[in-house]
Amino acid sequence: MDIFDSTITSFEDFPSERFKEQLESLTYESIERASQFVLENLPCIDDLFDVLLNRMRKSAYHKRLLFFNLIDCICIGCSRIENDVYKKFIINNVDEIIPLILPDDNLEVKKKNRETIERIIRSWSNNHVFNDTFISRAFSILSGVAKESRSICPNLSEKEIARLLKRMEEKRKDQNKKRLDLEDSHPLDEFLELWFNFNLDNSSSSSSSSSSSSSSSSTTTTTTTTSELSSISTSLNSIRTNSSCSNNNLQIDIEIIEKEKEKQKEHFNSFNDTSITTPSTSSSTTSSSSSSSSSSSSSSSSSSSSSSSSSSSSSSSSSSSSSSSSSSLDNSTTNDNNNNTSNNKNNNNDNYNNQSILEKERIYKLDYEVYDSFKSQFTIPEWPSYEIEDIDLFTSGNDGEYQDYIENEYNSFDQNSYLEYKKKYKNNEFENSIGNSNNYYNRNSSNNNNNNNNNNNNNNNNNNNNNNNNNNNNNNNEDSGNFMNSILNYCFYEHKNHFNFIKNNRNNHYPYNTSGYLNNRVDNYQPYSPKTTSDSHKLQEYFNKIDYMNKNGISVVDICAKSKSFEIPNICGADGGDSDRMDIDTNNSLKNENKQNDSHRGKSRKRRSSSRGESEHSRYYRDSSRDAKDRDSRDHRDNRDHRDSRDHRDRRDSRDHRDSRDYRDHRDSRDYRDSRDSRDSRDSRDRESRDSRDHRESRDSRDHRESRDSREYRESRDHRDHSRDSRDQYRDKDHRDSSDGRDHRNRDDKYQIDKRDNQHHNERNDSRNDRNDKNDKNDKNDKNDKNQEKYSERYHNERDSRDNEKDFYRSKETMVNNDNRSSSNRSSNRH
C-alpha cells in the first residue's frame, strides 16, 4: 500500500472505489480495461476480488457470466506475468462462484452458461493457470450444481419457491379468516361438555339429596313441595344423562320411566295426605301439583281415582293450575256424575301424563343449555300454572300487577266455592279445554295410538304408553334441537286452558282488560268494560294467532333469539285493532315486577287482615272493584299523560318543521339575492368595459375627424394664401406702376399681420396634432403590450412543448442506441 500513498488524495481515489465504478458499466468491450486495472493494482487484489464477488451476488443472472469472464481475464493476465496472488481467493471461493452463474429457472441459459464455464476451466487447465486438483474440484462442483439446486428446497427452482411461499401466505390468511367454523359446531360446545360432565358426576349426590328432601316432606307443606320438585328435576336429569350417554339418538328406557313414575307417585301421595288436612297453607306453593299428578298413571283404576280426587282437593287450594292438575280435577267431578266417563278420563290422564313425561325426557344437554341461555333474556315470573319454572314470555313490565291479581284470585277461593263454580260450569266445555292440551301433546302419536286412548282396559293403556314412548323416540330426530319451541308451545297451551277457565266462569266479574296482559305499553292499555264483548275476545284472538304460528311453522324461539321484541301477525281481527306487540326488556321488567310484587304483597296482607270476618266472595268483589277503580284512574291518567306528550311532540315537530322551512326559504332567498347581485355586478362590469371601448372608439373617430379637418383647413389655407399672394403680386405690380409709397407701406403692414395670424394658427394646429399623435401612440403601445404578453405566453408554451418533444426524442434515441448496442454485443458474443 506504500505505492499508493503518494497518489491517493481522497476516498474516491482508492482502487476499490474506482473498480466499483468500472463494474457498474461493465461490458464485453470493457473487460480488458477492467482486468488491466486489476493488474495495475495487484497489491490490493484481494479487495478488488471482494468487490467483484459482492457485485456478482447482487447482479442478475445475465450479468454474472460477464463477471466470470472478467475473473478469467484477470487469472490469465496474472499467470502471464507469473504472479500467483489470484489463486488463493479463487480457490477459497470457487464453491460460491460457479453456482452463482447457473440459473435454476431457465434450462437453456443454464445449459449455455455451463458450456461457457466448462470451456473456461479447460482453458485454465491448458494454460496451466490452476493445477489439476483445482480443475477436478471445479468440474465436480459444476456437475454437482447440475444435479442439485443451491436453494433451500433441493427439488424446486427459485420461482417455484416464490410461488410456494405465496401459497403458504394465502393459506395462512385463509386460516386466520376461518378461525371459528360455525357450520359443523355450536358456539357453546365447550361449556356444554363441562355442564354435562358436572351433571354426570353429581347425579348420585343429587339423587341422595332428593331422597332426603322427600323424607322431610311430611313435616310441612312447603318443604314437601320443594323436595318433590327437586326430586323430579334430579330424576329427570338422571334420565337425561343416562339416555344421552347410552344412545346418541336419545332413546329412553321404559323401565327407568316406570321407576321414576313410581317414585313420583309415592311423593304425590305423601303430599296429598298433608295437603288435604291443610288446604290453606298449601296455597303458597307454586308449580308442584302439576308435576306430581303426572306420576299417578301406572296404578289401578281405583287407586288412580282416589289419587285424582286427592289431587283435585290439593290443586284447588294451591296456586298452580296446569293442564295436568286441571285434568285430575275434572276427573274427580265427572266420577260424581258418571263412572263410565271417569274411566275414559283416567285413560286420557294416563296418556297425557306419559306424554308430558316423554316431553320432559326429550330434553338433552344442548336443549338445556339453549334454555339456560334464553332464560336470562326474559322475566322470571312466579306463575302457578307452569310445570317448567323460570320462563315466561308473556309477563313483563306493567303485567306484574295483572299476574298478582290472578294469583290472589285463585288463592282467595276455598274448595267449596271452587266446586260450586265447577258444578255450574258445563262439563263439555271443560273437556274441550283439556282436550286441546291432550291433542297437542299427542300430536306426534299415530292414529292407532289416538284410538287406543279411548279404551277402558289398563292393559291397553300400558300398551298405549309403550306405543307413545316408541313414537316419541322415533320423532326425536325430527324435533331435535327444538326444546325451546316445545316449552313455549307448552306454555301457550297452558295459558290458553287457564284463561278459558277464568273467562268462561268469571266474565261478569273480570275487572281487568285481557289486552293489558298481552300489551306491555301503557298507551295501548285500555280499561275493561264488562258490557262489551270485544275485550273478552282479545285473549282468544291472541291464542288464535299463536295457533296460526304453530300451524305455519313459525318458531317463536327464532323470533325471540333475533330480537328482544317481536310482533305476531293480526290474522283474526276481531276488534279490527292493531297487532299485539310484546316488548321484552329484561332489566326494566324485573325491576317493575319486583316493585309490584312487593307492593301487592303488602296490599294482600292488609286485605286478609281487614276482611277475616267477611266471606271470600264479598272480599273478592270489593277488592276487585277497588282495584278496578284504581286501575281505571291510573289508566286514565296514563292515557292523558301519553296524549299530552304526544301533543307536545306533535307541536314540537310542527315547530321544527316550520323553522326548517323558514330557514330553507331564507337560505333560498339569500342564495337568489347573492346570485342576482353577482349577476348584476357582472353585467355592470361588462357594461363598463363596453362603454370604455365605445368611448375609445369614439375618441379615435373624433381624433381622426379632427385630423382630417385640420388637413383640409391647412390645404384651404394654403390655397387662400396662394391666391392672396398672387393678388398681392398684382397689387404690388400696380403699386410699383403707380409709384405710390403709401400703398406700398400699407400693403406690407397688412402682409405682416396676415403672416403673424397664420403662424399662430399653424402653431395651434401643430400642438393639437402632436397631442393626437401622442394619444394614438399610447393606444398603440397598449395594444402592442397586450399582444406581446399574449405572444410571449404562447411562445413559452410552444417552447415547453418543443422541449418536451426534444426530451422524448432524445430518450427514444438513447433507447434505440442502447438496443443497438445490446444487439451488437449479442452479435459479437455469437461470433
From Swiss-Prot:
In this chain the CID domain maps to: 1-146
Question: Positions of the region Disordered?
Answer: 205-233, 265-354, 434-480, 572-831
Note the InterPro entries from the entry. CID_dom (IPR006569), ENTH_VHS (IPR008942), Nuc_rcpt_coact/corep (IPR052600)
Against SUPFAM superfamilies, the record matches this protein to: ENTH/VHS domain
The record, for Pfam families, names: CID
Where in the sequence does UniProt note compositional bias of the Low complexity kind? 272-354, 434-477, 817-831
Bias category Basic and acidic residues: which stretches?
592-601, 611-813
Q: What is this protein called?
A: Putative uncharacterized protein DDB_G0281733
